[in-house]
Amino acid sequence: MSNVTHQPKIGFVSLGCPKNLVDSERILTELRTEGYDVVPRYDDADMVIVNTCGFIDSAVQESLEAIGEALNENGKVIVTGCLGAKEDQIREVHPKVLEITGPHSYEQVLQHVHHYVPKPKHNPFLSLVPEQGVKLTPRHYAYLKISEGCNHRCTFCIIPSMRGDLVSRPIGDVLSEAKRLVDAGVKEILVISQDTSAYGVDVKHRTGFHNGEPVKTSMVSLCEQLSKLGVWTRLHYVYPYPHVDDVIPLMAEGKILPYLDIPLQHASPRILKLMKRPGSVDRQLARIKQWREICPELTLRSTFIVGFPGETEEDFQMLLDFLKEARLDRVGCFKYSPVEGAGANELPDQVPEEVKEERWNRFMQLQQQISAERLQEKVGREILVIVDEVDEEGAIGRSMADAPEIDGAVYLNGETNVKLGDIVRVKVENADEYDLWGSRV
C-alpha cells in the first residue's frame, strides 16, 4: 500500500502592472510555504487563481477573458486583484467563479484556497521556498513595493477606489526585504508603489528601525539606505513633489541610478486642472533644467495622455511645445480611454476617437525624433549594461537609462561570454529611436 499523498496543485495567472506582480509573488510564496505546488498548466491544477487588473477598460476586458479561459480549462477559479473590487461586474459575466477578493487581500485568498483545496501535511523546513520568496522576475532584478494605495484623486484614475488611500510599509520591513533580495543575487531593485514620493506621508514620516538603527520613513531616507546595498536602485512612479529635488544629489553621487520615472500626464494648465494634477509647466521645466545641472547623466521617463475630455488643439500644442523644450529621454503616451467610475467620464467635450488617434500619432512622431537624438548622443561613449538575455548570437541588456519591459535595450552582437545579471562596460556603436548597439570593452 502506497503512503504517497497527493500534493495539491495551484495554477496562477498574474495580469497588470509590477505592483500586481508583487502581490502575486506574495500569494505564491505563501502557497509554496504551505506545501502547495504551483503548476503552469490548467489541466494539472486543482484550482486556478487569477490576479486581475482593472485600471482601464482594455485591462478589464483582458482580465475577464483570462477568468473565462481559466473557467473553461479548469472550472475551479478564485479571482483577486484590482478588478476583484468590482465583484458584481465579474459575477455578471462569470457567475461560476468560486470566490472574489479585492487587491492585496492575501489572507482572504489563502483562506479560500484552504476551503476548496485543503492544506497538505507539510513541514515548511523541508520546503525549497527561497528566503526572498517566490519571484516572477528573472533572478537578477526584482520589484520592491513600498506602499499600497494613493491619496490623489486624479479624474482619469480609479486606483484609490480599488486599492484605497496610501498605506506605507514599515521602513524596517522594506529594507529587510531589500537585503534578502540582494543576498539572493538580485543586482537591480526597482522601487514601486502607486506614489513613491509620498512614502511615509500617511505616518507623518515617523522614525522606524532597521538593524537597530533609527531610519526616517521617507523616500529620501529609503534611497540613502538602499544605496548601501551596492546594487542598482531604480525609482518608479514618482509624483512631482518638491522633495523629489532631494534625491537628485544621490543620483549625481552614484548612490542610486540617475533615472526618474515621473508621470506628468500633460502640459496644458487647463487640462492638468481637469485631471486634478499639479499644473505649473514653467516650474516643471525649471526643475528639469536644475536636475540636469546637478546630475547631467539623469534619464527622465514620463507618461502622457492625449485626447483627454476638453483637450483643444491649443492644449495639445502646449504638450508638443513642452516635449520640444523638456527633451525627455523615455516617454509613453496613451489615448484617453473612459474607465468606469472615473470622474473624467462626467466632463464635457469628449474628444472624438479619430482626433485622439491623430494627436497620438503626432505626439509619437515628435517624441521618436527626440528620443533618437538623445540616444545618438551616446554613440562613442562607454556605458554600464546589465545583461538580461544570452544566446548563441549574443547578449541583450539594459543601460542605467533603461527599466525592464518599458524602456529600450542594448544589443551586444556576438557577445556570448557573459551571464544573466552581469554588469559589463560597453562602448556604444549605433543607435535608433529606442535601442543601442555596442561591444564590450
From Swiss-Prot:
Function: Catalyzes the methylthiolation of an aspartic acid residue of ribosomal protein uS12.
Cofactor binding comment, as recorded: Binds 2 [4Fe-4S] clusters. One cluster is coordinated with 3 cysteines and an exchangeable S-adenosyl-L-methionine.
Keyword hit for Iron-sulfur: yes
Top-level lineage group: Bacteria
UniProt source species: Salmonella paratyphi A (strain ATCC 9150 / SARB42)
Localization in the cell: Cytoplasm
Domain annotation MTTase N-terminal: ranges: 8-118
Coiled coil feature spans: none
Protein name: Ribosomal protein uS12 methylthiotransferase RimO
GO cellular component: cytosol
Binding site for [4Fe-4S] cluster 2: C150, C154, C157
Domain Radical SAM core as annotated: residue spans: 136-373
